[in-house]
């Protein structure tokens, strides 16, 4: 298995986010692309990242392959990536993942070997679920709202009421409500749920990777989905379970 991309910084940014959510994970390599699909340790959130083979400069994978890595250790190596670097990732044995970071301008070539892990984990299958509404907004605005509300409360409520996207929270000493008018997105219903700000603040660290975020809600309010693009390589989606009402 081997791939090469000039969008190395995007992969670095993705693992920078994932290291605070996941520990040891399996990477699923197929002829179609690379995927991480796993639950966090508390089994509250599901992470689904898929990078499409057709978007790499080079991609070679004849058969499906599963290999385990420690996300933090992987990021420690990817952290060496800077602007204009090219990343090559290759697996030639069961023991190591080989990473190569090249920069033609600086004329540098750095190579690493990361020890692989044997992770006994059944692959999760995400059922095809029709999302009822998707609200697109600047990722930096959504991050700021979540960060501000975490100073007031531990949870927030996200509501889509026709053309209004409402984010609100109730704290011990103050409440906050922010309303955004969605003039370009037609929706005639009303959906809402309560979600953990701890997790939302972890997910919104992906803001630096993508200028916009899609906040997707489904009719049964079982979970919320945040979707970010990983540059032009693919997408990173976070599924967060809706908190059960105390009522």
Q: Whereabouts are the PLM-identified features?
A:
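DNA polymerase sliding clamps and clamp-related checkpoint/processivity subunits
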Residues: 1-19, 24-151, 157-247
